[in-house]
Amino acid sequence: MAEASIQIEVVYATVQRQVLMTVDVPAGSSVRQALALCGMDREFPELDLSHCPVGIFGKVVADPAARVLEAGERIEIYRPLLADPMEIRRLRAAKAREKRTLPG
């Protein structure tokens, strides 16, 4: 008898390209197992799926190896930030202060 499977989605995006895959995985699969099966690392060879932060419908999954998937869920693979958000805000505030103090 065939093992029951569920259908999930896996999504990843870069600046240049977005990919959404629909994948059948065995029922009871963890997020980590589904990532190993999905093939996203073949689409994006630079992607290290064992260390990427992931989420399901916008909520970060703390332990992808323990989180069991349900049918219809979407795994989102997150990219690292290119810049520190606090530093960006600091620079933006400094630039705004500069504009206010320049004679105009």
Curated annotation (Swiss-Prot):
Entries under InterPro entries matching the protein: Mopterin_synth/thiamin_S_b, RnfH, RnfH_sf
Cysteines paired by S-S bonds: none
UniProt-listed SUPFAM superfamilies: MoaD/ThiS
Pfam families from the UniProt entry: Ub-RnfH (PF03658)
Origin: domain of life: Bacteria
Entry's family note: Belongs to the UPF0125 (RnfH) family.
Name by which UniProt lists this protein: UPF0125 protein PSPTO_4512
Record organism: Pseudomonas syringae pv. tomato (strain ATCC BAA-871 / DC3000)
